[in-house]
Design a protein with these regions (language model features):
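ATP-dependent adenylation/nucleotidyltransferase module used to activate substrates
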Residues: 2-194, 303
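ATP/NTP-dependent adenylation/nucleotidyl-transfer catalytic domains that generate, transfer
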Residues: 7, 14-23, 199, 203-305
Length: 305
């Protein structure tokens, strides 16, 4: 008489045949060890360079990520030109740092010229980048963009090779992103391993390196505080913006802007201190009377205008 095995409804059935192999968990690019990331970065650079005898542009900003891609280009042994596009409003010491690393300094126009022609850039109108640094020099470019820098970049950049079109003539540039999947910890460790000397602003008074520090244009409206910390630390920067903003205000019709604002001082205050125009309008024109934005700026930053 054969023996029967009684199974409950939720018992697992006996396995028949060979057991299935467990799927190995796929490692995300960000989770790979640094050695593997370096290997991939060097392969990408050498592959990109093999397509042409012309040099590749290493887009250098003076920041830590720029130092990393410059070192990778050297390690890869490729033909390149490291180029810093001088915005004229980067932190002090940036040009000196570029010169110490053998980087070409190039300038198309100054930030003062941009303000005089177009007014103050803000979070919604970031025309300054296109005017000062987003333009074609060579057909191919290496850039230090990383997905871990922001959610916006993580969504926008998926692959380490992209095509960009610069300017009104839509000039084509093939862009390579060798450290796209690197974390802050990867960058800091690579800098330590290679003995890279970064911009002085990355170090505290004791000489400790800060991997989370970020450089950028002073007063940049894309920063989380819309550049307010830069203006508070450098009141002369406020005067510089306003001096050139006055030229823009006096030499351009800008009817829509002048319908909303009474002066360039008001435009500046709205851009720096308020997210929405309605909030600005309600703040300066309230039950206690209209606020003088020029006087407010003088008092807030301790400057004469």
């Amino acid at each position: 008489m054969s023996e029967h095995i009684q199974l409950d409804l939720f018992d697992d059935l006996p396995q028949q045949g060979k057991p299935k192999k467990k799927r190995q968990k796929k490692i995300k690019p960000e989770e790979e060890p640094l050695e593997k990331k370096i290997e991939r970065a060097l392969w990408l650079l050498r592959t990109a360079a093999a397509d042409s005898d012309q040099p590749i542009e290493v887009s250098y900003s003076g920041g830590k990520d720029s130092d990393v891609i410059l070192e990778l280009a050297r390690m890869a042994g490729i033909k390149y030109r490291a180029i810093y596009k001088n915005t004229t409003i980067d932190p002090p010491g940036t040009i000196k740092h570029c010169m110490e690393n053998g980087v070409e300094v190039m300038r198309r126009k100054s930030f003062a010229e941009v303000i005089q022609a177009k007014g103050f850039p803000n979070f919604l109108r970031r025309f300054c980048c296109a005017e000062l640094k987003e333009y074609k020099v060579l057909d191919r470019s290496v850039q230090g963009i990383r997905r871990s820098e922001s959610t916006k970049r993580a969504k926008r950049y998926k692959e380490p090779t992209v095509c960009r079109l610069y300017g009104s003539k839509k000039q084509h540039v093939e862009v390579f992103l060798p450290i796209l999947h690197w974390t802050d910890a990867d960058v800091a460790e690579f800098i330590r391993q290679r003995g890279i000397k970064c911009h002085p602003l990355y170090y505290d008074e004791q000489g400790n390196f800060c991997p989370k520090c970020r450089l950028g244009c002073m007063g940049c409206p894309q920063k989380s505080d819309r550049g307010l910390a830069d203006f508070k630390a450098n009141p002369r920067l406020v005067k510089f913006w306003l001096r050139n903003g006055e030229i823009w205000w006096n030499t351009h019709k800008i009817k829509k802007t002048k319908k909303k604002f009474k002066s360039h001082y008001e435009v500046f205050v709205r851009n720096i201190f308020f997210d929405r125009y309605d909030d600005f309008h309600n703040a300066i024109d309230n039950m206690f009377g209209k606020i003088d934005c020029k006087q407010f700026l003088m008092d807030y930053f301790g400057i004469d205008l």
